[in-house]
Amino acid sequence: MTKSFALALGGGGARGLAHIAVLEALDEMGKRPAAIAGTSIGALIGAAYAAGLSGKAIRRFVLRLAHDRAEVFRRLIATRAGTFANLFNLGFGSATLVDAEKFCQQFLPDQVPEDFGELEIPLTIIATDLYRRQQAVLSSGALKPALAASIALPTVMRPVVLADRVLIDGGATNPLPFEELRGRADVVVAVDISGAPTEERRDIPNPWECLLATVLVMGNAITAEKIKHGAPDLVVRPRVGAFRALDFLQASAILRAAEPVKAELKEKLAALLEG
């Protein structure tokens, strides 16, 4: 009898577009996860897949946007939490550019529903409770506010208030939430897109790039410690470390770089499910 599996999709900004290659590989295998857990970009892509979109449909949606910069800019304008001039204010409190909930409305496929209960695959979303200093696990109720909370990167996106909790990006506490899937399937698969270390780059990043890179470094450290204390059954790592967190307009290049992960996933997952 074939075993069931659950899928954890990690955070990492634009690198998370590599998750699409993983979903395409599952479609090619004819396999669907029993449950999905996601953080940040992993939550967004996981929601689209859980809503019934195929990996290829998600790819088409992303590439259509990435190849139309005017449309991307138009949608970004609609997500503003304030004026773009606020970016240059000294107080970070007024420097937030994007309303995370508006972002989800603008940049998610129309097929993504309003409520967790309408999804075809159970989905768990990770955000961070800013004042309780712990992760927030969201799996029922309104879907898009939960997604917004999971991607609400401080200084870039406004925090989201849910049930009297102030929530920010889930990557601050749990960038790869595989442990949330234990006991929900026979096999747990985690997709880590934090990127391998590199000694090749020597360029000095600008302040925003440095901030975002720091978040990724911290997330990588959190994930490494979690794996030490109890690894999932399978971890796959698309080779997308050369891309920066905001390289969304390089979607085609990210997807090309992620393509080799398909063969690895198919071979290793098939062995686990049939073993």
Which ranges hold each PLM region?
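Patatin-like phospholipase
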Residues: M1-T39, A47-G275
